[in-house]
């Protein structure tokens, strides 16, 4: 599981930062990639990575501001050209209006897609989707227009079958191991009964990634970010600009760091950086946040972060 940032700027592109887009790479887990926001130029950014558009099967849009959606029509069109009929379906999740924006853009440009395109427009907060490996939750944020944050929870991995322990118990190898790993109670040929649950190691705890759209401080942030292994939070303003952040419905680096500290986040990644912050000023943002939450980084375009499995606490073992 990796995060790769395709755009980390705020509002409009600059020489050093493109506008918002981040890829959650789940290639080892489900052989897929999920995109969060698709600002203008995202497909150009993808060309500078190893990301293959055919691997992207879900796109999550936080809100309808242009710096988060203007790259969608071009990306969808190029995805069609690159894969033809072999391209699998793609689903876009986002606020009301996202389907109109995409469909009208494709219609007026007479763009025909070679793959199935589906939309899920968000209405209710809570569980958005669930598959064998992940749950995704969506909750409203506090921005000038409807805006959402996403919490991706990986399900726990089942423990490994303890083969050495089975050998010590003189349990015969073979198909019986499969039944024991499934947690069944098995009767052996010698009449003994063994419970598979006694021969399975501890489960490996799944990871949690929280990706937020533009927002000022709101109670839902704690709900979204609690115990996250990685929190991706906007940082449009610096420490001394709290009033500006409030007025423009954005956040400061210190507000993001305070949230991370309060809810047990493991790592904080700050994005949506204003073009006013360049060179040494970026380091100032990071330094301000680190005073509150040390494991903080201001990200730049093409930064990639591996998300390790969390260590279990003693009371979870």
From Swiss-Prot:
GO molecular function: 3'-tRNA processing endoribonuclease activity; zinc ion binding
Keywords: Endonuclease, Hydrolase, Metal-binding, Nuclease, tRNA processing, Zinc
Residues in the signal sequence: none
UniProt binding sites for Zn(2+) 2: 67-68, 214, 272
Cofactor: record remark: Binds 2 Zn(2+) ions.
EC number, UniProt record: 3.1.26.11
Entry annotation: catalytic residues: 67
Reaction equation(s) it catalyzes: Endonucleolytic cleavage of RNA, removing extra 3' nucleotides from tRNA precursor, generating 3' termini of tRNAs. A 3'-hydroxy group is left at the tRNA terminus and a 5'-phosphoryl group is left at the trailer molecule
InterPro entries: Metallo-B-lactamas (IPR001279), RibonucZ/Hydroxyglut_hydro (IPR036866), RNase_Z/BN (IPR013471)
Binding site for Zn(2+) 1: 63, 65, 143, 214
Entry cofactors: Zn(2+)
TM regions (residue ranges): none
Oligomeric form and interacting partners: Homodimer.
Protein function: Zinc phosphodiesterase, which displays some tRNA 3'-processing endonuclease activity. Probably involved in tRNA maturation, by removing a 3'-trailer from precursor tRNA.
Family label: Belongs to the RNase Z family.
Annotated protein name in UniProt: Ribonuclease Z
Organism: Ligilactobacillus salivarius (strain UCC118) (Lactobacillus salivarius)
Gene: rnz
């Amino acid at each position: 599981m990796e995060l790769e940032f395709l755009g980390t700027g705020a509002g409009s592109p600059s020489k050093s930062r493109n506008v918002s887009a981040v890829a959650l790479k789940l290639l080892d887990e489900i052989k897929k990639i999920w995109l969060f926001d698709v600002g203008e130029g995202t497909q150009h950014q993808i060309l500078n990575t190893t990301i293959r558009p055919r691997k992207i099967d879900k796109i999550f849009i936080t809100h309808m501001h242009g710096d988060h959606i203007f790259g969608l029509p071009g990306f969808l069109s190029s995805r069609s050209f690159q894969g033809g009929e072999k391209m699998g379906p793609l689903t876009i999740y986002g606020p009301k209006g996202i389907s109109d924006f995409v469909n009208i853009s494709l219609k007026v440009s007479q763009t025909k897609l070679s793959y199935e395109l589906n939309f899920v427009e968000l209405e209710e907060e809570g569980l958005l989707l669930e598959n064998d490996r992940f749950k995704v939750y969506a909750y409203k944020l506090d921005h000038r227009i409807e805006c959402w944050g996403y919490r991706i929870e990986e399900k726990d991995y089942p423990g490994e079958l303890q083969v050495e322990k089975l050998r010590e118990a003189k349990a015969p190898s073979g198909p019986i191991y499969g039944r024991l790993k499934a947690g069944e109670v098995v009767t052996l040929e010698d009449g003994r009964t063994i419970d598979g649950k006694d021969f399975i190691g501890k489960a490996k705890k799944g990871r949690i990634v929280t990706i937020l759209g533009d927002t000022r401080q709101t109670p839902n942030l704690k709900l979204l970010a609690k115990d996250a292994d990685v929190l991706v939070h906007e940082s449009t303003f610096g420490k001394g600009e709290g009033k500006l952040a409030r007025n423009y419905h954005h956040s400061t680096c210190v507000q993001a760091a305070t949230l991370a500290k309060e809810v047990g986040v493991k790592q904080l990644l700050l994005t949506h950086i204003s073009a006013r912050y360049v060179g040494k000023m970026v380091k100032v943002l990071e330094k301000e946040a680190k005073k509150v939450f040390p494991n903080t980084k201001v990200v730049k375009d093409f930064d990639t972060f591996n998300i390790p499995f969390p260590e279990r606490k003693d009371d979870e073992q």
